[in-house]
Amino acid sequence: MGYRVAVVGATGNVGREMLNILEEVEFPIDKIHAIASRKSIGVEVSFGDKIIKCEDVAQFDFSTVDLVLMSVSGTFSKEWSPKIGAAGPIVIDNSSAWRMDPDVPLVVPEVNPDDVEWADRKNIIANPNCSTAQLVVALKPLHDRARIKRVVVSTYQSVSGAGKEGMDELWDQTKGIFVLGAPPPKKFPKQIAFNVIPFIGAFNDDGYTDEEAKMWQETHKMIDPDIALTVTCVRVPVMVGHSEAVNIEFHEPLDEDEARDILRNSPGLVVIDQRHDKGYMTPKEAQGEFPVYVSRIRNDPTVEFGLNMWVVADNLRKGAALNAVQIAQLLHERGLLNQAVLAG
């Protein structure tokens, strides 16, 4: 027997990927609904070998489903997630709206799976920011072994993190440069083709962007509030796949060989780390894949106990849709989905 599942925001990059992954992992589904805004009513999306038409979020009866995956804006989620949760189903929300709410668990299943047990406070579970998701999967097993003191991260984030408009802008500018000149930027503040932009989101008063703040706030909530973490987030002209250069300082001794072994034996991680010119992972190779990949693991000789590493993942998958589906699988394994429906 399967569940009744709705995907809200089904026409976007992440919403479509949610549908793809639900089918790929054979999540037990009796009935699937694609939900979108009024302007997308009737738009067709695929679910395995089936084509389903989008239904209107304003008219849909959410008491008829057990689980809702949300891929919408934070503003939309702030309005709709509480309404949907009150109707009975558990909402797994991919926006930033609920991540720091003390009554909403922020979950990466490889990192803090037990937090799903208190999802019934609001019937909402938050998905972390895409760049945070891959980072914490790599940090958690090392923290468990040697207690992380400080982390310095530089991200190299693909344009798909800004949605279809971001991908279209990179494509149009790249083509345009070789024909009539690049069209002016619309989605990004400056030209993204053949360029990098050290700015994602909006500036805060301290000079950091909200994208950078999300990473340390979310890491603190999921792993340990005592970890000192500083971040620079950069948009790069890559379609799909986020990369991160990560420097870690530990309280306790941990060398590169032991770290490599720990990471190899940790869930959700694949270590690709050979010291030749192709012995590392790139975002292109990670596209379409489930794991978080770790490469370039090496000691940092500038501190007593330190490491450097390179972390890569498909941001539309582990950074968003896959993590949401993995949370759904965790709820299923623990028998929490049916409990939510009965409580509603």
Where do the model's predicted regions map?
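Helix-loop-beta segment of a Rossmann-like dinucleotide-binding subdomain
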Residues: 119-126, 195-206, 309-311
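Glycine-rich beta-alpha junction loops
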Residues: 38-40, 130-131, 155-162, 196-203, ...
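Oxyanion-binding "anion nests"
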Residues: 192-239
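C-terminal active-site/capping subdomain that shapes the small-molecule cofactor and substrate pocket
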Residues: 227-344
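Generic solvent-exposed, charged/amphipathic alpha-helical segments
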Residues: 19, 216-220, 260, 264
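N-terminal Rossmann-like NAD(P) cofactor-binding subdomain of oxidoreductases
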Residues: 1-192, 228, 261, 275, ...
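A glycine-rich, Thr/Ser-enriched phosphate-binding loop motif common to dinucleotide/cofactor-binding enzymes
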Residues: 123-134, 207-216, 221, 319-323
